[in-house]
């Protein structure tokens, strides 16, 4: 289960007790049942804390998509083309709501990830070396040529 959150206090001042707090939660999992269970547990915990602290809570979903599994054959072809270039491969789940997640419902889909320095992703310090970007683009081009040639 991947979990990310943020808290925004209003007013956000050192010496003032806030009168409003906005808490966002981003839950991700490749297993729909586990995702639903986590959502229910978070909602129950928030309701319990709100009742014990006698505060009001408003909860709403900003976005919700069922997890998808990418096309196994296409993922295998991505791995084949990476290995042909002596590149390492690793299968990684991603619940970030990429376009590929939406397209998988319509057609076979896969994603190609390239390494970020220090593993930082979706972070202001994220950086990927040019050579890794070129390698990822080469894998994509080789796959596209293969698919175009049928």
Each predicted region: which residue ranges?
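Solvent-exposed, non-transmembrane alpha-helical starts
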Residues: 34-38
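His/Asp/Glu-rich mid-to-C-terminal helical/loop segments that flank catalytic regions of hydrolases
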Residues: 39-44, 114-150
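Short beta-strand/turn micro-motifs at beta-sheet edges
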Residues: 10-15
């Amino acid at each position: 289960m991947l979990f990310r959150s943020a808290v925004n206090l209003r007013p956000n001042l050192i010496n003032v007790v806030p009168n409003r707090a906005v808490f966002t939660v981003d839950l991700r999992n490749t297993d729909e049942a586990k995702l639903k269970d986590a959502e229910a547990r978070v909602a129950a915990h928030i309701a319990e804390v709100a009742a014990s602290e006698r505060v009001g809570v408003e909860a709403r979903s900003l976005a919700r998509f069922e997890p998808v599994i990418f096309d196994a054959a296409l993922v295998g072809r991505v791995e084949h083309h990476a290995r042909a270039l002596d590149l390492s491969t690793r299968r990684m789940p991603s619940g970030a709501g990429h376009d590929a997640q939406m397209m998988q419902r319509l057609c076979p889909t896969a994603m190609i990830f390239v390494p970020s320095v220090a593993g930082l992703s979706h972070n202001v310090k994220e950086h990927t070396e040019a050579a890794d970007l070129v390698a990822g683009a080469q894998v994509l081009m080789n796959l596209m040529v293969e698919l175009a040639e049928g």
